[in-house]
């Protein structure tokens, strides 16, 4: 029978490898089933809840003490990343405390955030009237662009033969 102490290095290595695959953003404690469109129709659905929403930034601006992002929402996948191939779930306004560099949080970037809905706000999308739920952001993750992903160093571990082009 193998010595339990001899298995410890293998277990530690396995834990490090599995942990390296995890997302940097944890939304487990937040409710991601309620869409912004549902909350725009009935704000009570979001009362006393931490919400997780994500999507594509469609507008952004810095205000005196916070940054406002208008986001077209999409359902979140198991990693908390917006699934942009799914049907959008409406738009929302995210208010992030403090200053965000809008060059980084530009139109088209993908974000996931958690927070609480504080109100709904009447506005417009183009000429069409629209009701936006307003999310007070607690945590936010800016997903890497395809270019950033392509330039990220890749680490491969294993035994075998491979070809890199």
Sequence positions of predicted segments:
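OB-fold and OB-like single-stranded nucleic-acid-recognition modules
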Residues: 21-165
